[in-house]
């Protein structure tokens, strides 16, 4: 969550025209450290010893350990227009252009229009943050000697500079602005005043910068506190932060007020909170605020809570059908409630046992006023209702309340009731958490092994830095400032797990990968807690430790016991290292206690993953094997992920075979069918989304089992939405919710692709599926048909198909003329507003398409080229197979694909997917548009009148597949991998080189049919955790 302190009355003194940026830290050193050195917290106790593990101790500054470039940084929209630009930015030569663009545009301080008052080098940015944190640590007495403090600064700087780790965005936004540049601003937040031993509001908020993005707030069952929460949420949204609250404390609408009246219930106040979030845009931006609202399953209003979002979605759909703007930020959605929050139901073990036994579940009153029994529900039916609503709109998710509190380190101070918006931070009410993430790929060695010793050293360094920030940061409310000091929760995590797994030659969906994930997470959590105990020996435990000592030690023992359950198929040395580490954690923890009540979470690491040039975020697998790399001089280059090459090398392939496989992936966007690749290794390269020319992807169950491998080794939870394909059923979602509880997860959120605009489809019977499979397996004898590049005109009298469409209220008609065998050969496009500009353009577009089809341009080329083209008018349609069209051209192309091509990658229809076995469109075709979807209703109708002609075109299509494509090994489905027999791909290569930005947009639009455009640059986003991430500008629509 982007967190920015107010800019009013802010002044700065950034060093202008510095002639020697390479000496940005030359004024510091051991002598300077001696001046800053203090023992404020530790008194007579010895401080931390710190040995350099990363930055060479050879007299050079950390910034002299890398080469530097001068580059321009720019953020452009999909049309190439610059939204942000800064020239002559100094960045490490090893950083990608995307990392440069993200860091310069988001994290450099100052006015972009005044470069003399703006940071212009990455070394300024990193030095501002790491020097400030180190100085604070020196002054507070964390380090044993000034030399230890200076070594800490050097290592922390080196790790940040070389992309080994990164703090969450608020740290880069705010830390060091006062200490390094004397920036000042108005009083607003709260901090802990160590001198007075209480909370206070600083005169200058930049002196105590806000460093956290994750907040949890409480609410009591009275009007004053309910409105107080509304006010504090508004202030959090103003500063760009996200917040979560459990509303189970608010009495049900079925209960009584103290004066005898009828209460409103939590849902009524949710409408108030939702309205505030919709009006106060997050961080002053146009995106919606990030918030989480939960309700415990035993609350009497639980059914209304479960159904509330879907009930409002149906209103939006009705408005859209009447012509209102269908954009997610448009009039239709703006006029309905509950669109600004994630919703979660808190499930208890007794409820889940009732589901297992198919028993009734009794809710309970919040107060003792009622004399009647509260509502009772069949537990399984209630779970099915959650799944049904999540199937429709993605909410509610679930949080497993009993499991969460079973792993709670501070139960004597209160229960864990809520989470932050992304569900990874779960702790006491009115607390905050600052996050940091380690880039796992930086610790993979040349031989493919993982350097767990250096990984632990990096974890220790960042954890110390996070701890130093706690009392030097400010917080949006007084209770949060007080509790942050009292409990000091931190959230260290990691990123790039998916890349590490692929590099190791392991499928993401494998016991070996889950074993590796468990071991790495155990090492992360173990080192964080070991460091916390080490800090306790120096500066003391957190204030709430004494009353929670026994439960905290019990939880630590649970973590150690879980080490023995790590899957043995993973790397044995990592599992053994985790066991030994946790033995040490228990020993030092029992002796000194712990400095921090919580230590780790797994956040989605959106924007900071780009800063570290990570291929994958958080615990996620890779989204695709092919990426689009931004070039320093502008434009984009299509590249195959380096992890593919590393994975192939680990699997033992020789250099020539690897080169052939990489060429194939580059040409085809998929590794399926690559020459020389063994079938048993295909799963290693499976990604989160199916490639355009492939059929494989990681199943949703694998995402849940990977979460289960990591969960026992985290203080908090995992921010990860389990993405499901369009054709899953509500029962699949209910099964996932129950399975997550059985596996010991703390939370799970489901998002079904297309759920924002799709309706339920009846699944086929087993008999019908068997019939379809048998039909697909039929292979006819074919004859050789030779097509020449000539114009094939339609007969004077021909059949045609007329289709009426409506896009966001703009009506039009498509009339497609057909050859005798059912192929489309011409198209007339008529818009309702005759004579309009768009009408003329569409008429010309129809003529161009007609000529193209008659001269033999394959239909799938036309469909692939024009699908997902984005411009106005766009929005909801009346076609159940194409719920949202990104333009009229997009609608026409996808309608052609659905109607005349086999497969239906162009709509979210589960029925169509079942008809083709889920394998997508057949990408091989005869010339002159010979491909036709002979299973479609249109072709079925035509087949009655032209059976012989249709049989001919079926044979021609199959022949073209055999002649022009290389079989993918499945003789029963007729799909080729799209590789030309002659190996000619020059045209495709040229297209990739000149249309990189369009290619990336097309690639991402295929991942999820209803992914929104970025609110910053307009590019299509990809779902990341509970929010969306833009791979063009690095914007995270909800999380840091």
From Swiss-Prot:
<feature type="binding site">
    <location>
        <begin position="213"/>
        <end position="214"/>
    </location>
    <ligand>
        <name>substrate</name>
    </ligand>
</feature>
<dbReference type="GO" id="GO:0000166">
    <property type="term" value="F:nucleotide binding"/>
</dbReference>
<feature type="binding site">
    <location>
        <begin position="604"/>
        <end position="608"/>
    </location>
    <ligand>
        <name>substrate</name>
    </ligand>
</feature>
<feature type="active site" description="Cysteine radical intermediate">
    <location>
        <position position="422"/>
    </location>
</feature>
<feature type="compositionally biased region" description="Polar residues">
    <location>
        <begin position="969"/>
        <end position="979"/>
    </location>
</feature>
<dbReference type="InterPro" id="IPR013344">
    <property type="entry name" value="RNR_NrdJ/NrdZ"/>
</dbReference>
<comment type="similarity">
    <text>Belongs to the ribonucleoside diphosphate reductase class-2 family.</text>
</comment>
<keyword id="KW-0560">Oxidoreductase</keyword>
<feature type="disulfide bond" description="Redox-active">
    <location>
        <begin position="214"/>
        <end position="433"/>
    </location>
</feature>
<comment type="function">
    <text>Catalyzes the reduction of ribonucleotides to deoxyribonucleotides. May function to provide a pool of deoxyribonucleotide precursors for DNA repair during oxygen limitation and/or for immediate growth after restoration of oxygen.</text>
</comment>
<dbReference type="InterPro" id="IPR000788">
    <property type="entry name" value="RNR_lg_C"/>
</dbReference>
<dbReference type="GO" id="GO:0050897">
    <property type="term" value="F:cobalt ion binding"/>
</dbReference>
<feature type="region of interest" description="Disordered">
    <location>
        <begin position="909"/>
        <end position="932"/>
    </location>
</feature>
<dbReference type="GO" id="GO:0004748">
    <property type="term" value="F:ribonucleoside-diphosphate reductase activity, thioredoxin disulfide as acceptor"/>
</dbReference>
<keyword id="KW-0170">Cobalt</keyword>
<feature type="region of interest" description="Disordered">
    <location>
        <begin position="969"/>
        <end position="988"/>
    </location>
</feature>
<dbReference type="Pfam" id="PF08471">
    <property type="entry name" value="Ribonuc_red_2_N"/>
</dbReference>
<dbReference type="Pfam" id="PF02867">
    <property type="entry name" value="Ribonuc_red_lgC"/>
</dbReference>
<dbReference type="InterPro" id="IPR050862">
    <property type="entry name" value="RdRp_reductase_class-2"/>
</dbReference>
<feature type="binding site">
    <location>
        <position position="242"/>
    </location>
    <ligand>
        <name>substrate</name>
    </ligand>
</feature>
<feature type="binding site">
    <location>
        <begin position="420"/>
        <end position="424"/>
    </location>
    <ligand>
        <name>substrate</name>
    </ligand>
</feature>
<keyword id="KW-0547">Nucleotide-binding</keyword>
<keyword id="KW-1015">Disulfide bond</keyword>
<dbReference type="GO" id="GO:0031419">
    <property type="term" value="F:cobalamin binding"/>
</dbReference>
<dbReference type="InterPro" id="IPR024434">
    <property type="entry name" value="TSCPD_dom"/>
</dbReference>
<dbReference type="GO" id="GO:0071897">
    <property type="term" value="P:DNA biosynthetic process"/>
</dbReference>
<keyword id="KW-0237">DNA synthesis</keyword>
<dbReference type="InterPro" id="IPR013678">
    <property type="entry name" value="RNR_2_N"/>
</dbReference>
<keyword id="KW-0846">Cobalamin</keyword>
<dbReference type="Pfam" id="PF12637">
    <property type="entry name" value="TSCPD"/>
</dbReference>
<protein>
    <recommendedName>
        <fullName>Vitamin B12-dependent ribonucleotide reductase</fullName>
        <ecNumber>1.17.4.1</ecNumber>
    </recommendedName>
</protein>
<feature type="binding site">
    <location>
        <position position="169"/>
    </location>
    <ligand>
        <name>substrate</name>
    </ligand>
</feature>
<feature type="active site" description="Proton acceptor">
    <location>
        <position position="424"/>
    </location>
</feature>
<feature type="active site" description="Proton acceptor">
    <location>
        <position position="420"/>
    </location>
</feature>
